[in-house]
Amino acid sequence: MKTVNILVEALPYIKKFHRKKIMIKYGGHAMIDEAAMDSTARDTVLLKYVGMEPVVVHGGGPEISRAMNKMGKEPKFIEGLRVTDEETMEIVKMVLVGKINTSIVSKICYHGGRAIGLSGKDSNLLLARKRAPHVVRDDETGERREIDLGLVGEIESVDPGIINMLTDNNYIPVISPIGVDRDANTLNLNADTVAGEVAAGIGAEKLIVLTDVPGILEDPSDPDTLIRRISVDELSDLVKSGIVEGGMLPKTLTCIQAINDGVSSAHIIDGRVEHSLLLEIFTKKGIGTMITE
């Protein structure tokens, strides 16, 4: 009887989101734990089979750093941004496109989905420009200086054509966060930003970001202070007050921007919880934080 009740509870959401695009950002535990990735891939396929149109963007920062260390190249970061020279860019492409993307595609296909891997270079999906030099301030002298981050980009535009073509033909696009500039140079992009920009570009109903925390917390040190629903204005106030910080800040800002760009709702959920995707979409209570206008 419990199973029947679960199915009945899910029905209104299945009807509401039928034929709607759902952007899913794979990250955190769902990227490094085989069982978690397998579970997330299975849930993604289920969304497709009940009539939704999932689109996946993945990151891969820790995997890139591990690959660099194996090759004897030390990863360098400036205030959380990876310095990307040409050699590093080759490693980034190898890990994101050659390893992580193909792994996600194969898992989705194993569970009965029809996944196709893409990068932002395919069909000029993600047109980008080189990021301006990053300005840092010396705490002792107060002197400000510019540091060139190399082949790090920021998105200029999203061409949704190839994604729409794939979803219209029952495929699940899986996108690596790599862009291309107007001179055909490859650029390293932030995966959270890519997920938000693509979600807006394809008119997604939802943006769901998988992380390693329960969601947005009133007290970052207490998982019991989960905020289950919050408006963009309320969330912006939390950002200004410093409650949202560290690794959650870019994810939160991505969600705010996505809502402002027309996505109906954004969700930050714990990818370590089995079937977290399904619990967030198909239950009234959800499992993480839902952000709305």
Swiss-Prot record:
Annotated residues for binding of substrate: G60, G61, R82, N188
SUPFAM superfamilies noted in UniProt: Carbamate kinase-like
Gene3D superfamilies: Acetylglutamate kinase-like
GO cellular component terms, semicolon-separated: cytoplasm
Transmembrane segments: none
Compartment(s) where it occurs, according to its Swiss-Prot or TrEMBL record: Cytoplasm
GO BP terms: arginine biosynthetic process via ornithine; L-arginine biosynthetic process
Keywords: Amino-acid biosynthesis, Arginine biosynthesis, ATP-binding, Cytoplasm, Kinase, Nucleotide-binding, Transferase
Domain of life the protein comes from: Archaea
DNA-binding is among the record's keywords: no
Record-listed E.C. numbers: 2.7.2.8
Catalysed reactions, as listed in the record: N-acetyl-L-glutamate + ATP = N-acetyl-L-glutamyl 5-phosphate + ADP
Pathway: Amino-acid biosynthesis; L-arginine biosynthesis; N(2)-acetyl-L-ornithine from L-glutamate: step 2/4
UniProt entry tagged with the keyword Transcription regulation: no
CDD domains: AAK_NAGK-C (cd04250)
Site (Transition state stabilizer): K25, K251
Entry's Gene Ontology molecular function annotations: acetylglutamate kinase activity; ATP binding
The protein's enzyme class: transferase
NCBIfam families (alphabetical): argB (TIGR00761)
Family: Belongs to the acetylglutamate kinase family. ArgB subfamily.
Function of the molecule: Catalyzes the ATP-dependent phosphorylation of N-acetyl-L-glutamate.
Protein name, UniProt field: Acetylglutamate kinase
Record organism: Methanothermobacter thermautotrophicus (strain ATCC 29096 / DSM 1053 / JCM 10044 / NBRC 100330 / Delta H) (Methanobacterium thermoautotrophicum)
Encoding gene (name): argB
